[in-house]
Amino acid sequence: MASAVPLKSQLNNNSWNNHWGKTSDVAAYDASATHVKTLNHFWKNRFSAISLERNKLLDIASGGGALLETLVRQDCILPEKLSEFYSADLSYSALRSVKSKYPLSKVLQTNCAQLPFKNESFNFIISQFGIEYCGLSAFKECSRVLRKDGRFIAICHYQDGAIQAECERNLKVLYALSDIDFFAHARRAFNAKDDKMSGDFSIKIDATFRNALYDVSDLVTRQPYAAGGQLLRLFNDTRYMYENLTRFDTSAVLHWLTKMEEELTNYQERMILMLQSSLNNLSLNKAVEAFTANGVRNVKIDVLSANRNFKPFAWAIEVF
């Protein structure tokens, strides 16, 4: 078994780490989403009859530990009863969050398509909306490090499903925000107001920015919860600060605008990655073949949906 390596920050500039380090932890669904009840039921059902005592478990592409939190909260996992459990992810910031919440977890900053573990190291490997981002090689690596009598359980994004539709709606709004060029107009307007510019030039800057605000207001009206509610926050806070600029330091406002732009850009990149990595029938079969190619294993595939009236949102893959 490989030993856990100290967290390092050399990967801080990758887009995956940007999502965890610079943005709010906004997933494709939020804590109130109907999908969450389905996910909780799935994991509770799978682990209710399984004893993990003295077993070794790997949460691959763990992110900030959302799956681990679900399992612990539902008493599916008692960390102190496990022989070892690892959270592996590319993001330093995400793993730091895992370690702060679950000190017993061994965190490993690594490319999940190149796991530094010996063959047949783990009894259980789990993932929720993570492994598919790492490509087919990550499934092959899981097959390699999973014991012959072990169990692999993963929830993966379903192509053309409910979450993908939500991602596409979010992207459409963010592309529209980019077309408005809102942040550039906002910076010019705040600077002009702070410098107490007068005359036609200042009036033009103010009018242009107010038009941009109106356009964002229209986006918010049509999609009030877009980008995890960040677009609504951007509109409300920017408008308030502009109308009450004497109460704020302009440099602090400009810094806030930069951070908001980074956050929305990183959220947009996250949505794009999600669309690119969601599995269709062909890619799902290739993922399963990673386990069956080197020996006979039992495979169970389920399709998860919030209810019969909604599109599926995820594949549930079990190998045992």
Stretches with model-predicted labels:
Residues 167-197:
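Conserved Class I S-adenosyl-L-methionine
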Residues 113-125:
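A short acidic, Gly/Pro-enriched loop at the edge of an enzyme's catalytic core
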Residues 2-48:
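Class I SAM-dependent methyltransferase Rossmann-like catalytic core
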Residues 133-142:
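A short, conserved alpha-helix within the catalytic core of class I
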Residues 186-297:
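Substrate-binding/catalytic lobe of Class I Rossmann-like enzymes that use SAM or dcSAM, i.e.
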Residues 149-158:
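Conserved beta-strand signature within the Rossmann-like core of class I S-adenosyl-L-methionine
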Residues 56-114:
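Class I SAM-dependent methyltransferase SAM/SAH-binding core
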Residues 303-320:
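Core SAM-dependent methyltransferase catalytic element
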